[in-house]
């Protein structure tokens, strides 16, 4: 992080004009926006993938597991021992247990996707509805695409000052805080807001 970025973080933490209880959470979301976009895409791809688990898949999986004979009742050796072990596992409900496990994993993945998507929607709604076009573009390029302040200054059509870049990010964080406050009070999204606060605190303490 360069000197401009370091100064920017200090300004975001101490110079914002928004007065509400979600300023820290808004800054946390803004700082992790690019990561959230990547995580959401990865979770979506995983959810859209196959969650099928067949007996053939179970057999392939069991073949690769190192045998632990301490708990086996099978006394034979070699191929017959491996085959018997796999047969015992299959008859003992191995496929059903793995399917149940995968269903739990899919449900956990779905819930995590919904939460990450909610965080992204807070930001996208805030910048779309509460920012002007220039501020919105600056924020999305910096926090969404990871472009530096200098790069934004150099590549913005018509030019833009470093002060304008800093102000755009500050205004964006204020807008996100306002959106969080609105959702907490008016949209009955308290559970997500509390989860976000706990996530932020855990991140800060790590």
Question: How should these model regions be labeled?
Answer:
Residues 1-126, 178-206:
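N-terminal interaction/assembly modules
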Residues 117, 149-150, 155, 169, ...:
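A general secondary-structure boundary signal
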Residues 125, 130, 150, 163, ...:
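Catalytic phosphate/metal-binding cores of nucleic-acid and nucleotide-processing enzymes, i.e., regions
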Residues 128-147:
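Short amphipathic alpha helix immediately N-terminal
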Residues 140-144, 157, 177:
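Short, locally clustered residues in the helix-turn-helix/winged-helix DNA-binding domain
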Residues 145-164:
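Helix-turn-helix DNA-binding module
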Residues 165-183:
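DNA major-groove recognition helices of helix-turn-helix
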